[in-house]
Design a protein with these regions (language model features):
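Divalent metal-dependent catalytic cores for phosphoryl transfer on phosphate-bearing substrates
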Residues: 168-274
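Generic hydrophobic secondary-structure packing signal
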Residues: 9, 152-155, 200, 204
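Exposed alpha-helical structural elements
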Residues: 9, 48, 100, 104, ...
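Acidic/His-rich, divalent-metal-binding segments that scaffold phosphate/diphosphate chemistry
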Residues: 87-195
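Non-catalytic interface/linker regions that flank or bridge core catalytic/transmembrane domains
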Residues: 2-132
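Metal-dependent nucleotide-binding catalytic modules
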Residues: 251-260, 264-304
Length: 304
């Protein structure tokens, strides 16, 4: 559980970001000039850990980094970071040979800062977010596969901006807006670097279930956030016939769950490529799927 002060600053940042006319909503995230600059970058952290442990074999490296909740792995294109580095419940004095790893992890997770050029309010808000959600740090600079124009973190912020700008988002109750905000921040939290990752909705939902334990919220709220994350790829599964409209309707019939997923799907599509062509390619399918599934949901709710 994180402190009340960190929690309050986290939610205050999100509340400020969603306000009409906020610096966040007025920022052109699609610009090539927009970037999230870390004082201690993800890439530097990976290189420092690799250099520090270069004389250890793979099993020894895994054992050492595992103490801190992460692993350094060689992917198809990149040396990548898996997991979420942390020094929680660890004392540097007790770690002997791992003490230097402790200091690198502490610098990356607890002492790090984000800078966004010419965006002082958004810089402050993002630093409040990473204090409560340091897992987000692992996404900054994490390259996606070739279809995407943005790293995972910038993509996530663009999705959040698209969600908060959506007309239907403004009509949602406060709790639904909060759930959708948290779902967006973690919807790609486990996405693999530099490759297509079909498992990430399920894996991200699973990890989010653990990450959300740091917040004092009811189990039903956590479950709803994880439901949104697990099904944020509903459009692809609908379009490819992987999941039937009836199955979607049964799973997503409660409250505003499907409406929130439609808002998320549109923002997600628009946040893939700078030129917007990915959204143009699938917007008709999105509309068709939304109509079909909504009709079945209406029938189920009416018959209940």
């Amino acid at each position: 559980m994180i402190s009340n002060e960190i929690t309050q600053k986290f939610f205050k940042a999100l509340d400020e970001m969603e306000k009409q006319g906020s610096e966040f909503l007025c920022t052109d995230i699609s610009s090539c000039d927009f970037s999230l600059e870390l004082k201690y970058s993800r890439r530097d952290f990976i290189e420092d850990i690799n250099r520090l442990l270069q004389k250890h074999d793979h099993a020894q490296k895994t054992d050492i980094t595992g103490l801190f909740g992460f692993a350094i792995e060689q992917g198809p294109l990149y040396t990548t970071l898996r997991g979420y580095p942390s020094v929680s419940n660890l004392n540097e004095e007790d770690l002997a040979q791992s003490a230097r790893v402790f200091r690198y992890v502490k610098e990356f997770v607890e002492e790090n800062e984000i800078t966004i050029k010419d965006r002082p309010q958004l810089t402050k808000q993002m630093n409040a977010i990473i204090k409560a959600l340091p897992e987000f740090l692992t996404l900054i600079g994490k390259v996606q596969h070739h279809t995407h124009s943005y790293c995972v973190a910038v993509h996530t912020l663009k999705v959040l901006q698209g969600v908060m700008s959506h007309a239907d988002y403004q009509k949602l109750p406060n709790e639904d807006r909060r759930n959708l905000q948290l779902a967006v921040l973690m919807h790609d939290i486990t996405k693999k670097e530099g490759e297509i990752d079909k498992t990430h909705p399920v894996c991200s939902a699973k990890d989010a279930g653990f990450i959300l334990n740091k917040f004092d919220m009811p189990k039903a709220q956590k479950d709803d956030i994880c439901l949104l994350i697990r099904n944020h790829d509903w459009l692809e599964r609908y379009n490819k016939g992987i999941t039937s409209t009836e199955e979607f309707a049964k799973t997503l019939k409660n409250g505003n769950d499907f409406l929130m997923l439609c808002i998320l799907a549109q923002a997600d599509l628009k946040a893939v490529q700078r030129d917007g062509m990915f959204y143009e390619k699938y917007k008709d399918v999105l509309q068709k799927g939304a109509i079909e599934i909504n009709e079945i949901i209406h029938s189920l709710v009416t018959a209940a």
